[in-house]
Amino acid sequence: GVVLAVRELHAWGYLKSFPTLVAVQAANCAPLATSFSQHSEHVLDVLTKPTIAEGIASARPARGAQILAEMRALDGRFVTVGEQDILAARSALASRGSYVELTSAANYAGWLKYKETYVHEADRSVVFPLCGAGLKSAH
């Protein structure tokens, strides 16, 4: 979805260049991030554990090979976030008036991790989705 949107915005002239795409996965279930870091063209079988970010918990993501290829073609990045990072991100967002569900909180945690990991890119403008009410989760 995001790749298609970025490609269309570029084709229509709304983007002069492609932005850096950052994909976030929970550390407990990160087959794409693992496959990407190991330069695999296909999603590798990885050991996964349950994660509180249920919306991104997929050991065999649909179109995984396509996602890996698109992220490479667009010079994308992957980051993984731990369960405590996700909970802390949701608390931080809630303190600012946005009570989101945990999968969305993983996006914010991913942005924080991205800033730590790619310090030289930390001052860039970012867009990340925050959707889903926090009342959806028992955590």
Where are these regions (language model features)?
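Short, glycine/acidic-enriched capping/hinge loops at junctions between secondary-structure elements
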Residues: 1, 33-34, 138-139
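Phosphate- and divalent-cation-binding pockets in alpha/beta enzyme and binding domains
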Residues: 1, 31, 89, 109-110
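Short Gly/Thr/Asp-enriched flexible loops that form oxyanion-binding sites at enzyme active sites
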Residues: 1-9
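Gly/Ser/Thr-rich beta-alpha loop segments that engage phosphate groups in nucleotides
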Residues: 2-3, 28, 134-136
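Active-site/ligand-binding loops adjacent to catalytic centers
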Residues: 8-18, 22-102
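Phosphate-binding loop/pocket of nucleotide- and phosphate-handling active sites
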Residues: 16, 44-47, 70, 105-139
